[in-house]
Amino acid sequence: MQQYLDLMRLARDTGVTKTDRTGTGTRSIFGHQMRFDLSEGFPLVTTKKLHLKSIIHELLWFIAGDTNTRYLKANGVSIWDDWADENGELGPVYGHQWRSWPTPDGGKIDQIRNLVEQIKTNPDSRRLIVSAWNVADVDSMALPPCHCLFQFYVAEGKLSCQLYQRSADIFLGVPFNIASYALLTMMVAQVTGLKPGEFIHTFGDAHLYLNHLEQADKQLAREPKKLPVMHINPDVKSLFDFTYDDFTLEGYEAHPHISAPVAV
């Protein structure tokens, strides 16, 4: 995954030093884009070992419309713990906006269900969009959405996805985001009778935290390995029926994990 290393190197070498909400400081770039052809393998970073279990469970949690960490904690996933309140609540974050976007008249819009139906019935639509950035709810969220809008595109029997990410922690967050949206694209493709096409990752503020520079240098010194292959249970026909056991990763060889502090 040279695309990811190129992003990291660009921020490391040319990024502007900026302050940030956490007080840590960053090296920041703006407006970068990466493309991944999903026929070439599953884009899981190989220059450090990633916890795929967390990525899959978080995505299933989003799709379920959940905003409480109970499900995640029950499955050994702690990535949202730092933002949750004492009851595990996060406010109207991703899952709520994806599945229950509130309307002025008190109704709710299931963006994900509508998206799947539109891909099936009107694949040339230019409105195959899901947004998590609900301005009215942002102040009620434990953490406003970083990956805030994505759009699907159907061409020649293939489904592609473009994500706009307003804020991107290059070292810790971006590898998760790449894998999560690549997997979502594969899942939606399966349930709509399409083949996976490309995942396109477009960034607003992409940054390396200043306390991640040493770790970034270590990762940049490593050579990427061959991408693994993700197998999805072909019997699953609804996006809402997937479980953790429906995914099998084959051939994942990665360099050792590199630890780094999370900026909260």
Curated annotation (Swiss-Prot):
<comment type="pathway">
    <text>Pyrimidine metabolism; dTTP biosynthesis.</text>
</comment>
<feature type="binding site" description="in other chain">
    <location>
        <begin position="166"/>
        <end position="169"/>
    </location>
    <ligand>
        <name>dUMP</name>
    </ligand>
</feature>
<dbReference type="GO" id="GO:0005829">
    <property type="term" value="C:cytosol"/>
</dbReference>
<dbReference type="InterPro" id="IPR000398">
    <property type="entry name" value="Thymidylate_synthase"/>
</dbReference>
<dbReference type="Pfam" id="PF00303">
    <property type="entry name" value="Thymidylat_synt"/>
</dbReference>
<keyword id="KW-0545">Nucleotide biosynthesis</keyword>
<feature type="binding site">
    <location>
        <position position="51"/>
    </location>
    <ligand>
        <name>(6R)-5,10-methylene-5,6,7,8-tetrahydrofolate</name>
    </ligand>
</feature>
<feature type="binding site" description="in other chain">
    <location>
        <position position="21"/>
    </location>
    <ligand>
        <name>dUMP</name>
    </ligand>
</feature>
<protein>
    <recommendedName>
        <fullName>Thymidylate synthase</fullName>
        <ecNumber>2.1.1.45</ecNumber>
    </recommendedName>
</protein>
<keyword id="KW-0963">Cytoplasm</keyword>
<feature type="binding site">
    <location>
        <position position="169"/>
    </location>
    <ligand>
        <name>(6R)-5,10-methylene-5,6,7,8-tetrahydrofolate</name>
    </ligand>
</feature>
<dbReference type="GO" id="GO:0032259">
    <property type="term" value="P:methylation"/>
</dbReference>
<feature type="binding site">
    <location>
        <begin position="126"/>
        <end position="127"/>
    </location>
    <ligand>
        <name>dUMP</name>
    </ligand>
</feature>
<feature type="binding site" description="in other chain">
    <location>
        <position position="177"/>
    </location>
    <ligand>
        <name>dUMP</name>
    </ligand>
</feature>
<dbReference type="InterPro" id="IPR045097">
    <property type="entry name" value="Thymidate_synth/dCMP_Mease"/>
</dbReference>
<dbReference type="GO" id="GO:0006231">
    <property type="term" value="P:dTMP biosynthetic process"/>
</dbReference>
<feature type="binding site" description="in other chain">
    <location>
        <begin position="207"/>
        <end position="209"/>
    </location>
    <ligand>
        <name>dUMP</name>
    </ligand>
</feature>
<comment type="subunit">
    <text>Homodimer.</text>
</comment>
<comment type="function">
    <text>Catalyzes the reductive methylation of 2'-deoxyuridine-5'-monophosphate (dUMP) to 2'-deoxythymidine-5'-monophosphate (dTMP) while utilizing 5,10-methylenetetrahydrofolate (mTHF) as the methyl donor and reductant in the reaction, yielding dihydrofolate (DHF) as a by-product. This enzymatic reaction provides an intracellular de novo source of dTMP, an essential precursor for DNA biosynthesis.</text>
</comment>
<comment type="similarity">
    <text>Belongs to the thymidylate synthase family. Bacterial-type ThyA subfamily.</text>
</comment>
<dbReference type="InterPro" id="IPR023451">
    <property type="entry name" value="Thymidate_synth/dCMP_Mease_dom"/>
</dbReference>
<dbReference type="InterPro" id="IPR020940">
    <property type="entry name" value="Thymidylate_synthase_AS"/>
</dbReference>
<dbReference type="GO" id="GO:0004799">
    <property type="term" value="F:thymidylate synthase activity"/>
</dbReference>
<dbReference type="GO" id="GO:0006235">
    <property type="term" value="P:dTTP biosynthetic process"/>
</dbReference>
<dbReference type="InterPro" id="IPR036926">
    <property type="entry name" value="Thymidate_synth/dCMP_Mease_sf"/>
</dbReference>
<feature type="active site" description="Nucleophile">
    <location>
        <position position="146"/>
    </location>
</feature>
<keyword id="KW-0808">Transferase</keyword>
<feature type="binding site">
    <location>
        <position position="263"/>
    </location>
    <ligand>
        <name>(6R)-5,10-methylene-5,6,7,8-tetrahydrofolate</name>
    </ligand>
</feature>
<keyword id="KW-0489">Methyltransferase</keyword>
